[in-house]
Amino acid sequence: LEKLIGKHSPDIIGLQETKVDNENFPLEAIENLGYEVIINGQKGHYGVCLMSKNKPVNHGIGMPTDPEDAQCRLVWLEYKTKKGSLFVFNGYFPQGESRDHPIKFPYKEKFYKDLINYLKQDFDPESHLIVMGDLNISPEDIDIGIGENNRKRWLQTGKCSFLPEEREWLENLKDFGLYDSYRCLYPEENNTFSWFDYRSRGFDDNPKRGLRIDHLWVTKSLKDLIDSSSIDYEIRGMEKPSDHAPVWTKFNI
């Protein structure tokens, strides 16, 4: 995290799968890096955090439909900018495992549906709004870099990440008025990914083998303000990294 901040100095950072409850979150260490922090965490599982240089004016934890024992997977903040309010959702979307899983796959579908309904009911697609994080879906075939045989096998066995049903859930985000910020700049790039399996050492291969499942989706007003976007392989290449590479988008806002 220190390396990422030193290199990019982001105004806003979203973390997913923090795996720590709120009481044990290293709040002081993060604040010493120069960031305000809003967390939604639980011990050993899930967990999300939004960090920002400027203090947010509003925030939300989870979704209105969440039960008391909901998995901690979503946090959103509202910031004031020179061009009005900016809403940022950071999510650790369920992975789903496979189509035939009786619990995880329906839970993933419900999470997406609940988020779409939440956006439609309480937020404006005309506003500056971002949905970002580990969405756990590759939107297009050019976002799949695990080899054609593996791609076919995953589809045949119903393994999650790019099933037709999952892509339909992403289409609902598009229908709300969101755009994949990376694809806005690179509509045909087919060899850049954000997740690389530890066990098969896909990051070390040439070409690298992975999936693009981490995204920043933005409303049209922000789409028109995109300056640049990329995935940071240098950070992913550090010693003992996450299996995900940082993804980022810069806006002229």
Model regions and ranges:
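Active-site beta-strand/loop signature of hydrolases that rely on acidic residues for catalysis
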Residues: 4-23, 88, 115-143, 181, ...
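Metal-dependent phosphoesterases centered on the DNase I-like endonuclease/exonuclease/phosphatase
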Residues: 33, 111-213
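Active-site beta-strand termini and strand-to-loop segments that position acidic
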Residues: 52-54, 77-83, 219-220, 242, ...
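Surface-exposed cleft-lining segments at the edges of enzyme active sites
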Residues: 64-65, 93-112, 153-158
